[in-house]
């Protein structure tokens, strides 16, 4: 009964913080990056700051002081009558200058939310919400083809995109016997990416001053998946620990539901 109250309390606290976190993650962290022009955008290094400092490595890590969202088997290491809660942040500072102008872009955002609570001895429940990818770009190009300039006029192309995809993990880790644990995470992928493309034509000969073509594409991602994980301690003492960890994530096809609209204005 006590574990049930503990789980309900943790879920209640989680529901209170989720709207704020989702709102914060609706802005692209890697804004104005040309690498986010196609597909899902810039893929995020997985794990909390503790694991990201190692390039996302850590499927074999198991410690009651840190939640390891990379391997659900590690959830079994949580101590009884305790719990772990972590909120991470991320900040980008971009500066660019030329001989005539300079610009800067700064953003601060909540990056991930992790929660780990014990359900029974050797059994832990974990929740993670973390970004999977970010999209943010703004590109403006001017047509330089002499043939188009002579027959159509001055043409300017504008491309603007923003959005992200987020993954939610709910999982259990169980330690059935000494030195071995396994676990499973159920993942829900969700994201919205908006891409705008505009073409502005200024004729050279025609009496029409300007013609504009506005286009918008909205991509919605919604898919589920799983992660299976296992860990085995070969040996452990007060000074050393050697653990083998493996994970398996079946392939998930993240195809978006896309809606596109194009409006011409003369």
Regions found by a protein language model. Give the residues of each.
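Bacterial Sec-dependent N-terminal signal peptides
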Residues: 1-28
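Outer-membrane beta-barrel porins/channels
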Residues: 24-53, 118-266
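N-terminal, post-signal peptide beta-strand-biased segments of exported outer-membrane/organellar beta-barrel
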Residues: 22-133
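A general structural signal for short secondary-structure junctions and capping/turn motifs
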Residues: 2, 75-77, 115, 220, ...
């Amino acid at each position: 009964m006590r574990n049930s109250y503990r789980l309900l309390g943790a879920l209640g606290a989680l529901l209170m913080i989720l709207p704020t976190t989702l709102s914060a993650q609706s802005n692209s962290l890697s804004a104005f990056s040309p690498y986010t022009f196609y597909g899902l955008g810039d893929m995020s290094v997985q794990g909390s700051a503790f694991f990201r400092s190692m390039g996302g490595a850590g499927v074999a890590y198991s410690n009651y002081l840190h939640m390891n969202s990379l391997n659900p088997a590690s959830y079994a290491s949580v101590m009884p009558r305790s719990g772990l809660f972590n909120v991470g942040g991320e900040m980008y500072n971009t500066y660019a200058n030329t001989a005539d102008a300079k610009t800067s872009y700064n953003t601060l955002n909540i990056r991930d939310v992790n929660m780990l609570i014990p359900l029974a001895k050797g059994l832990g429940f974990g929740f993670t919400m973390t970004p999977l990818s970010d999209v943010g770009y703004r590109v403006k190009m001017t047509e330089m083809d002499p043939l188009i300039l002579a027959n159509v006029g001055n043409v300017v192309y504008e491309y603007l995109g923003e959005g992200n995809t987020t993954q939610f993990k709910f999982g259990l880790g169980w330690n059935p016997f000494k030195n071995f644990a396994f676990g499973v995470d159920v993942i829900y992928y969700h994201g919205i990416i908006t891409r705008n493309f505009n073409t502005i034509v200024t004729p050279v000969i025609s009496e029409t001053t300007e013609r504009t073509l506005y286009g918008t594409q909205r991509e919605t991602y919604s898919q589920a998946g799983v992660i299976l994980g296992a860990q085995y301690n070969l040996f452990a003492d007060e000074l050393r620990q050697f653990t083998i960890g493996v994970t398996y994530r079946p392939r998930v096809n993240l195809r978006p539901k896309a809606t596109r609209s194009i409006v011409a204005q003369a």
